Amino acid sequence: MLHYLATILWLAVAHASPGTPVIDWADRNYALVSVNSEATAYENLVERKAGVSVPVSWNVWNGGVGDMAYVLFNENQVWKGAAAAKRATIDVSKSGQFNMRVKLCDDDGFSVSEPVTVRVADTDGGHLSPLEYAWGENNKPGRPHNKTVAAYFVEWGVYGRGFPVDKVPLPNLSHLLYGFIPICGGDGLNDALKTIPGSFEALQRSCKGRADFKVAIHDPWAAIQKPQKGVSAWNEPYKGNFGQLMAAKLANPHLKILPSIGGWTLSDPFYFMHDADKRRVFVESVKEFLQVWKFFDGVDIDWEFPGGKGANPALGNGERDADTYLVLLKELRAMLDELQLQTNKTYELTSAISSGYDKIAVVKYDAAQRFLDKIFLMSYDFKGAWSNTDLGYQTTLYAPSWNANELYTTDHAVKLLTGQGVAAHKLIVGVAMYGRGWTGVSGYAGDKYFSGTADGPVPGTWENGVVDYRQINNELSKYIYRFDAAAKAAYVFNKERGDLISFDSVDSVLAKNVYVQQNGLGGLFAWEIDADNGDLLNAMNERVRVKDEL
């Protein structure tokens, strides 16, 4: 009897399924683009890899080890081999969070381990959880799907403004423009930047060891290293604005995010790109930038301005710059089309341009539009505290009621561009989420405050002469509010101080909204989103009725 029982037990063991595998502990966080959290130079900041190797080993503490082993990612087989090896290596080339199991098999059955999580990060954000927007201030849901509604988000907004990506009402936007991506270059190539204390020096730190005319990140801490909501874990490879944008895009798959290259103080290098070699370096670096930072959907060129009259008065050659602008856009478009074939992703090429008639005249925009998906018409900054005698509307649709000959208007710019042959649907009209103004305004006649002269710039929110819409709205009781029905322009005036501020109000933005629909334009965009309390973006998204719909 004992011999019989022993035989039965032996047969049961001999024909039992393999023992349950237990996966050994390991750090299973990987990154296809690795970021050096201590680096300040872009050359040392990132390393792009085609794939990562994920090793796995296991033990069986009770029972047989099996004949064959399989490694499963999310229940899909990714490796097969001899079970006796008790180890495997899996090559991974896409991002995600994977439940990994080991499955052991023999002729009598199989056993499966408990899952462990393998996290492979990439800059498409596939490893992250969606970052949802929590509705705040006056923002309310609603976005038209037949037009562009865009806004600029600035890299430095995470500091004094306290405005990270999670505060941006992204469900209400079709496009977010990230300001700004710089172009490397030192003395003589980025002199305009020296007007901002510490900014030129910061760029030199970021561009250390990197060739002139390559793009970089101006502030790596703000962009990719600063812990923020949703990307604050110690082992999260992509923190900062970029990390949040990756996660926010998962929650808003409709959103297009474009890096805006240039801007007021970062446009100097463009003036040197008539040199084909310098231009080639730039275009290739933009391609590399998009390959590294996969959450971006193209590129925005913000050259202020071809022909000059920008931040650096020493630069500008109208005829040469006009040619440079066209060939630069052509080469960027060709590069993006080539990249699109490699990635199967659609890339947009856009450009922010001046709405001043004198600057529009420099460029053949009928030719430029062939390469552009959108033209962001900066229909603001017409007037400001750089002059204490030439007071006027800093943003307006039409000429003021008191100056019918004014040519610095949105309507005049649109007519000039469409007159050149630019397709109306490519034109995106600008909204100013800030005001420009003066203090000590006096000598005006009656209530014609712009007929006076000023003592200087009005005290500003972040710089004198410039006041955020949020602040204007919060302090509205201190002012007389007026809306020029002829110009479709808003302003406020404080008689005691002589503070006069021209700005976009809900009234003027609704007027721009109607204008866009009446003229078949592409939509609206705003500078800059952190200055709004939701009022202006709501007005940009408002479904307005025009006369032919009544």
Curated annotation (Swiss-Prot):
Protein localization: Host endoplasmic reticulum lumen
BP term (GO), one: chitin catabolic process
Enzyme Commission designation: 3.2.1.14
Alphabetized PROSITE patterns for the sequence: ER_TARGET, GH18_1, GH18_2
A single MF term (Gene Ontology): chitin binding
Gene Ontology CC entries for this record: host cell endoplasmic reticulum lumen
InterPro entries, per the entry: Chitinase_II/V-like_cat, Chitinase_insertion_sf, ChitinaseA_N, Glyco_hydro18_cat, Glyco_hydro_18_chit_AS, Glycoside_hydrolase_SF, Glycosyl_Hydrlase_18, Ig-like_fold
Principal cellular location given in the protein's record: host cell
Keyword Glycoprotein: yes
SUPFAM superfamilies in the record: (Trans)glycosidases, Chitinase insertion domain, E set domains
Residues bearing glycans: N146, N172, N344
Segment forming the signal sequence: 1-16
Chain span(s) of sequence motif Prevents secretion from ER: 547-550
Catalytic activities: Random endo-hydrolysis of N-acetyl-beta-D-glucosaminide (1->4)-beta-linkages in chitin and chitodextrins
GH18 domain span: 147-547
Keyword vocabulary terms for this entry: Carbohydrate metabolism, Chitin degradation, Glycoprotein, Glycosidase, Host endoplasmic reticulum, Hydrolase, Polysaccharide degradation, Signal
Catalytic residue list: E304 (proton donor)
Family: Belongs to the glycosyl hydrolase 18 family. Chitinase class II subfamily.
Protein's name according to its UniProt entry: Probable endochitinase
